Curated annotation (Swiss-Prot):
Cystine connections: none
Name of the featured protein: Leucine rich adaptor protein 1-like
InterPro entries noted in UniProt: LURA1/LRA25 (IPR039499), LURAP1 (IPR037443)
The organism of origin for this protein: Mus musculus (Mouse)
Example GO BP: positive regulation of canonical NF-kappaB signal transduction
Composition bias type Basic and acidic residues, residue spans: 28-39
Positions of post-translational N-acetylmethionine modification: 1
Length: 221
């Protein structure tokens, strides 16, 4: 029996949209596959196919496995790109944090300067208030002293010239004499008058006694 002619695979390729693998074509030709080629075959089909229908049943599995291989490689490529984007975002965030820290440091320095200026102004205001209070207290004490002196002088002057302060009918001289009586060893004008009268009497008596002595002396002589 003669071998059947090789079937036309173009119709199958047009229907599948893919080229028939070489291993399948060899099996259709009736050639024996080597052990290495059978092991390397992704379809895992060994031996020869007797008809085109049996070979066509394995074609979709081969095409599906070949079509799934590019899709499995796409996540591997997208994974590094996602890592790169994440690293880029982290770098940007770190740079922004550094900028924010520098801005925070500048703001803190400005706040410290403002606080120091406020404290200095407050100290100056307090010092000025204390100086003003001291000056006002000194001026008030001086004014009170002057007023007290003026009132005391006026009161003493008025008491001397006023007769309604308990000295009715008594002169100032007699009042001073009464005050001098209270002082021990102090001679009043009345004492001086008595002293002058007694001295005059004693002098007159002495004058009257001396002529008598002289006359008696001359008599005995």
């Amino acid at each position: 029996m003669e071998d059947s002619p090789l079937p036309d695979l173009r119709d199958i390729e047009l229907k599948l949209g893919r080229k028939v693998p070489e291993s399948l074509a060899r099996s259709l030709r009736g050639e024996e596959l080597a052990p290495r080629e059978g092991a390397a075959d992704p379809s895992g089909v060994g031996g020869s196919c007797s008809s085109s229908s049996s070979c066509s049943s394995f074609a979709p599995s081969v095409s599906s496995s070949s079509s799934s291989s590019p899709a499995s490689g796409s996540p591997r490529r997208s994974h590094p790109s996602a890592l790169e984007r994440l690293e880029t975002k982290l770098h940007i965030l770190r740079q922004e944090m550094v900028n924010l820290r520098a801005t925070d440091v500048r703001l803190m320095r400005q706040l410290l300067l403002i606080n120091e200026s406020i404290e200095s102004i407050k100290w100056m205001i307090e010092e000025k208030a204390t100086i003003t209070s001291r000056g006002s207290s000194l001026s008030g004490s001086l004014c009170s002293l002057l007023e007290s002196q003026s009132t005391s002088l006026r009161g003493s002057y008025n008491s001397l010239h006023d007769g309604s302060d308990g000295l009715d009918g008594i002169s100032v001289g007699s009042y001073l004499d009464t005050l001098a009586d209270d002082v021990p060893g102090h001679q009043t004008p009345s004492d001086l008058d008595q002293f002058s009268d007694s001295s005059i009497i004693e002098d007159s008596q002495a004058l009257h006694k001396h002529p008598k002595l002289d006359s008696e002396y001359y008599c005995f002589g």
